[in-house]
Amino acid sequence: PDCGRCDLKYPRWLPILKPELQENVSLLRLIQKQDRYIHVPFHSFDYYIRVLQEAALSKDVKSIKTTLYRLAKDSKVVKALICAARNGKKVTVVIELLARFDEASNIDWSKKMQDAGIHVIFGVEGLKVHSKITHIGMKTGSDIACISTGNFHEGNARMYTDYMLMTASRSVVREVNSVFTFIEKPYSPVHFKELLVSPNEMKLRFIRLINDEIKNRQSGRPAYIRVKVNHI
C-alpha cells in the first residue's frame, strides 16, 4: 500500500540487463547458438517479448505456438502474436479459460486473437493447461522453445520470481512441440524423455528420482535433493 510517505517506501528496483541480449542483436540467432536463461523479476521480461516481436516480423519464422494462462491488461505478448498472424505466420494459442479470477479477461483476449486469424484452443476437456511454453517454428528447421515457470504476463514478471529457458536444443524443442500435439489431439500416446509432463509421467518420475537419491545415500554416495515448488 502507498501511504504517501517516501521514507516508508523501498527504493525502486530495476531489472538487471543482460549485456549479451542487447537491442542491436537478433535474439533468435543468439538462442540458436546457445541456451539463454532469464530469471524474473531480476532479469527483464522484455527479452521474451522481444523474442516474440522478432519472430512476428522475421521471414525465417513460419509458426508460433504458445500457451497462455494469465495475461496483462494491455498484453504485449498478445499484440506480438496478433502481429505474427497478420504477417502470415501460423499462430496457435492454447488459452486456459479456467484461470481463476481471469476468466472474463481471457475470453476477451480469445475473441481478439480469433478475429486476427489466430487458431485458439480452449484447453483440454478434463484437464487444466497450466504449462507456460512457446514453440517457434523456423523455415530452416532450427526451431526454438521457451519454457517458463511463470505466466507470460508483464505484471506478474515484475513481482513473482520465475525462471525461463530459451533453447534450440533439438530434443527439448521436439518435446515441447509434442506437448502441443497432445493438447490438439487429447490423450494421444505421447512419451517424454527430456520434459516432465503431467498428468502423463511427472509424479512417477519425481518419485523415481527421489528414490534414486535415497539409494545413493544408503550406499554412501553423494545424495541431495534441491527443489523449488509452488504447491504440493
Question: Which residues make up each language-model segment?
Answer:
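N-terminal localization/anchoring segments of enzymes in phospholipid and broader phosphate metabolism
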Residues: P1-A223
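Structural motif
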Residues: P41, K228-H231
